[in-house]
């Protein structure tokens, strides 16, 4: 890379970083951190464990955001010095190191820029992920379990906490459905582009004749409800069923009827929870999931009105959005953004950042 090109590239990186810093508003974030640090230092903090957890989690996230921005700014500034050293010493190794760091900084900057695109009303929230097997029999159930593992691995790789609320296992293999939380700020904004129908094409391991099978699984992403959302549920409009928790193959995992299924009669929405220790805890968690589904229903109704005004079909639950092809070739391709990866195994192991970033940029472009 010529000296002039390097100079222009560094100016471009610095300019992009300035734009990102303006959107993030680092001074405001530092002020928010100071307030949260004061709250976290209060002797009464853990009198309310749930509130304490939210305060410490948000504090940790904001501190990480600021550190990440400051570190990236430092790396951009250091790049200029590194390239100057390479030129002065005429050292190929130093120049190679500088160019490698330049590529790494450019990638980190792209990732941070994507974060600034998460400006929707609920984007900063934690997320509830609901996956269900659709057409395709046992292959669909197996596919749904693969998707569950994919998202849980993605969260683990990023250091995000997760909690599985409910998993309904299929008889032969895989799962009928699952609901779990991704407990990190901006999890909803990041994962919401995953909502829709996912398609798997492969030679079925469950077919004795080794035939190719196409199966489908639906992914629903919900924002975690907060008190300010005012989602009220009339207990008289609920049907509450209790049952015994079960594991793979229908095996009982609890000797008491602690699992809870809630049916919201006006909308027909059904949610369940079986992973908490008691029936009371399972009902409370199921209520949280139901509130999230009702909030999402309200959001979709509002979005449908906007789409009708714009003549836009939107991105509904039933829209097919990604294909995972394992035979006759190997390719995972997003049908909206055209982003594709030729290594399905890596994708199923949680390497989906490229799809998420492409989806967020695609969504932002559609909003213009």
UniProtKB/Swiss-Prot annotation:
Pfam families: PCRF, RF-1. PROSITE patterns: RF_PROK_I. Keywords: Cytoplasm, Methylation, Protein biosynthesis. GO terms for molecular function: translation release factor activity, codon specific. SUPFAM superfamilies: Release factor. SMART domains: PCRF. PANTHER family: CLASS I PEPTIDE CHAIN RELEASE FACTOR (PTHR43116:SF3), PEPTIDE CHAIN RELEASE FACTOR 2 (PTHR43116). Peptide chain release factor 2 directs the termination of translation in response to the peptide chain termination codons UGA and UAA. It is found in: Cytoplasm. Its main location: cytoplasm. This is Peptide chain release factor 2. Methylated by PrmC. Methylation increases the termination efficiency of RF2. The modification N5-methylglutamine is found at residue 251. GO terms for cellular component: cytoplasm. Belongs to the prokaryotic/mitochondrial release factor family.
């Amino acid at each position: 890379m010529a000296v002039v090109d390097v100079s222009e590239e560094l100016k471009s990186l610095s300019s992009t970083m300035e734009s990102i810093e303006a959107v993030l508003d680092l001074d405001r974030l530092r002020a928010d951190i100071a307030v949260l640090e004061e709250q976290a230092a209060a002797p009464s903090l853990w009198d309310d464990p749930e509130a304490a957890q939210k305060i410490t989690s948000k504090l940790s996230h904001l501190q990480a955001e600021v550190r990440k921005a400051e570190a990236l700014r430092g790396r951009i500034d250091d790049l200029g010095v590194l390239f100057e050293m390479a030129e002065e010493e005429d050292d190929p190794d130093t120049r190679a190191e500088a160019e490698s760091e330049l590529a790494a900084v450019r990638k980190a900057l792209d990732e941070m820029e994507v974060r600034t695109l998460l400006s929707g009303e609920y984007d900063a929230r934690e997320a509830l992920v609901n996956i269900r097997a659709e057409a395709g029999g046992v292959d669909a159930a197996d596919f749904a379990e693969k998707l569950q593992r994919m998202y849980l691995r993605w969260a683990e790789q990023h250091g995000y906490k997760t909690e599985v609320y409910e998993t309904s296992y299929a008889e032969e293999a895989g799962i009928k459905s699952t609901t779990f939380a991704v407990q990190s700020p901006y999890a909803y904004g990041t994962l919401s582009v995953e909502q829709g129908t996912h398609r798997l094409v492969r030679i079925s391991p469950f077919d004795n004749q080794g035939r190719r099978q196409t199966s489908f699984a639906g992914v629903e992403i919900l924002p975690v409800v907060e008190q300010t959302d005012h989602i009220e549920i009339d207990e008289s409009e609920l049907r509450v069923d209790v049952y015994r928790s079960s594991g793979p193959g229908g095996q009982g995992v609890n000797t008491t009827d602690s699992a809870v299924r809630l049916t919201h009669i006006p909308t027909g929405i059904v949610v369940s929870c079986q992973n908490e220790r008691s029936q009371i805890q399972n009902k409370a968690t199921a209520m949280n999931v139901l509130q999230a589904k009702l909030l999402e229903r309200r959001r979709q109704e509002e979005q449908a009105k906007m789409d009708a005004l714009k003549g836009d079909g939107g991105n509904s639950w039933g829209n097919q959005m990604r294909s995972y092809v394992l035979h006759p070739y190997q390719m995972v391709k997003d049908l909206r953004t055209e982003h594709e990866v030729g290594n399905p195994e890596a994708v199923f192991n949680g390497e989906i950042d490229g799809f998420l970033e492409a989806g967020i940029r695609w969504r932002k472009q559609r909003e213009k």
